[in-house]
Amino acid sequence: MTEQTENATRLARPLIRLAKLVGVATSYVGMSHDYHEIEDDVLVAVLGALGIDASNDEAINQSITSIKSERETRVVAPTVLHVVGKESKVEVHGGMFDVPEASITLENGKQFTGKISHEGGEKIAHEINGSFFFTSYLVLPADLPEGYHTLEVTVGSETETATVISAPEKIELLDDMKNGSLWGWMSQLYSIRSKGSWGVGDFEDLKTMLVEAKKKTGSDFMLINPMHAAEPVPPLTPSPYLPISRRFINFSYIRPESMPEYLTLSHEDRAEVDALHEQVELLNDDARLIDRDAMWRVKKHALWVIYKAGRTKARQAEFDRYLAECGDEIESYATWCLCYDKWGAPSDDADNWVRKYNRDSEEVAQLREKFPDTLEFYRWLEWVATDQLHAAQQAARKAGMKIGIVADMAVGVHPAGSDVWWNPERFAKGATVGAPPDMFNQQGQDWSQPPLNPIALEQTGFRVYRDMVHGMFANAGAVRIDHILGLFRLWWIPEGKPATDGTYVHYDSDVMLGILALEASRAGGVVVGEDLGVVPAYVSKSLSEHGILGCAVEWFEQMDGVFRTPKDWRPYALASVNTHDMPPAAGYLEYGHVKLREQLGLLSGPVEEFQKSATAEHNAMLNMLVEEGYLDKAALDDEAANENEIVDALYRGLKGSPCKLMAASIVDAVGEKRTQNQPGTNNEYSNWRIPLADGEGNVVPLEKLFDEPRLQEITAIMRG
């Protein structure tokens, strides 16, 4: 039997002790239950990315001493989690006879008048540089209200402050989910176009989709791809999971004609905007790849026309309120956009502006002064985008949807994006985020995104994460967290290493889940965590305790080649037949995943072995559907001829689950077979550029989408 733990000799090594001290994993167990110990060079590099010197034995010992000393001498930790309705103990440090004095300023600026008591701790002294420090506890009362508060603690002559995140214990289910379930659709917004689109699906299309989906199918939500910000100038990164910022919205989704300012344009200006629209209108009926760049070159010109025309006093007042709410964050984002606009795309060149200058550079200040109108334009674009996304959510709720938009939160951001450039101290330098090898991605994955630094998160009260979650719930009824395991641990890959040579770095999941619970509860929303793949039992337990739904994918609900019957799936999950990283149902049944991976050279073994495994999986799924009564066995005699019936059976199985949320895929409902995204590829495959089309390759326009016979057949199954 393979050893599954590190031996005592290894655990005693200073490098291993240092890594464990700061939450860097020194071993892990993979998806196939294979045990791995992390090589020293990987640990040294990852520690370096955290800002911890482990370059030699002396540095390692010094780092251990320094970290322990800082933790044992600080008055209070910079971030404290409190659960509303319960007492919380906060560790404080001081001399043996010191009695801490504490006060709390609530987020509204008022002083908390409740009682903060003090308890003694263990009478064990920690000697640091000749002084002795003891641990005691402040007890925060159960009646401390929810919110982000400031705790001030004085011990002796030292005073320090901490951010108190006072959150509900868990997220309550919506009333309609407590004794039943809700169903909806999942889609890639950019792929669904109407006659009014500019070649790419936009916020007006989203509004129409939401209202039509409720009216014609009775669904209660629409899960869409991430709406995070993209580049301000072409070329635009196709992947919505590699944004330049997770705090702001992709303004290329704006519909110019939906703005109040469009209606008040002069005859000449409106004619110019309309003529620009006509330049890309034909793209809406093009079944070839989505062309974001062609769209944005033209649409941006139109938006400049509208921007220069001005706005009413009332609209200007709305704009001013938006800027005040965003604070400095909008300045960082707009400034980055301005630099990109005037100096070109970021690159790895040492002379490129993104490497040469920072937020405090004189050159950046001069650029802002030279182009105030362009700077204001980018602020304005973000306001308009936020306004239109919010309007789509409001329309969904007005139409009767219980949830409306399910927003998707990406794992990270572009390494040269605005978040990283303006606030590099928030991120780890010299590492990227990815995933270790598994059965679907045998070479592992490198997502080319710098990870948030967990040390910086704690020191800043998790402000960046709080703002991001708050912003998403402002325009959605639910948030799906992509790779929610990342709130517990992320796979860090040192710069220059393959995805296989990484390790896990742990985060303070209790605090991050607390933030989710606080923001979701305030918004009356739902949180879904994408928890597919290798998920430790403690993660599943914690998500459940916090009221966060997991994900159940029909093709993944199996153990040792045997599919679980849908009625045995866990109830607290968002269930679907497939994901955006798989071919649609019809394509998967035709082994599109095998063919594509062979074509792209993504298999680590012979294609015959992968095909054999895929065939066994395929047959096991169909057998389960037959045995459970979802599929007539006669359909197996000619699978190609009975493709629709088999897809319907997959959805009957989905509907037969007890899951609180169930999502039908728009691509399945029109017969699409092409894969939207193939993990492990970049330019080798046309990821995130596949327009919505039927099985014959014909574009399905939004105007006809919800009247499609196949979609109505899937609807009938989901409505039960």
Question: PLM features: what roles do these ranges have?
Answer:
Residues 1-224, 262-267, 521-522, 526, ...:
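Carbohydrate-interacting/catalytic domains
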Residues 48-110, 114-115, 122-148, 153, ...:
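Acidic/aromatic-lined carbohydrate-recognition and catalytic surfaces
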Residues 109, 233-386, 412-661, 667-668, ...:
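Alpha-amylase-like alpha-glycosidases and glucanotransferases acting on alpha-linked glucans and related
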